[in-house]
Design a protein with these regions (language model features):
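Interfacial juxtamembrane loops and adjacent helix segments
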Residues: 52-101, 105, 113
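Juxtamembrane segments of multi-pass membrane glycosylation machinery
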Residues: 96, 100, 104, 108-126, ...
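Short helix- or helix-capping micro-motifs
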Residues: 155-160
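Membrane-interface helix caps and helix-loop-helix hairpins in membrane proteins
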Residues: 164-169
Length: 169
């Protein structure tokens, strides 16, 4: 091999590394941009209900009695932490109504909301932070399966900008 082809190979690898870093930063940016402007989904409203310590049954029994309820009242009671309910109420509610769900995320989310406030972006930021663990995890998985750093970095790059992973981060 001549020195020119070796230099071209190094240059190619350097550009590839820069491209991977740029794509990774872009994927992280997508995860944290406009967290408060995305549509608040049904699952997110149920998550807010769960971390507030109320169950679906309690909400229906207390508030669906044939009278008009304002959105502000529902948000104040069921999408914010209040002193009536504790983290243990969150665990009990999950155990009775949705035992297939692990309480760890909901307890973490409850403490996160208590620490940083009940805004939509705050609740979503915890999930976005947790989603960053997918990068070392997918790299490690690829390393275990293929013993190849390049396969790992390609997988990280794909997951970084995957619409599915960005949307549900």
């Amino acid at each position: 091999m001549n020195s020119k082809s070796i230099q071209n190979g190094r240059l190619h690898r350097n550009w590839l590394k820069i491209l991977i870093v740029v794509i990774l930063i872009t994927g992280i940016w997508f995860r944290f941009t406009n967290l408060d402007r995305k549509v608040y989904s049904f699952d997110e409203s149920i998550t807010s209900l769960r971390i507030s310590g109320y169950t679906w049954t309690e909400m229906v029994q207390q508030d669906f009695q044939g009278k008009t309820i304002s959105v502000a009242d529902l948000q104040r009671k069921y999408q914010q932490i209040n002193s009536e309910k504790t983290w243990w109420d969150t665990v009990k509610g999950l155990a009775t109504e949705e035992p297939q769900l692990s309480p760890l995320y909901f307890i973490l989310a409850r403490f996160w909301v208590q620490l940083f406030g009940p805004q939509v972006a705050t609740v979503r930021s915890l999930s976005a932070l947790i989603s960053l663990l997918v990068f070392p995890s997918i790299y490690w998985l690829c390393w275990e399966l293929f013993h190849s750093a390049s396969v790992g970095w390609m997988a990280v790059t794909i997951v970084a900008v995957s619409p599915f992973h960005v949307l549900y981060a």
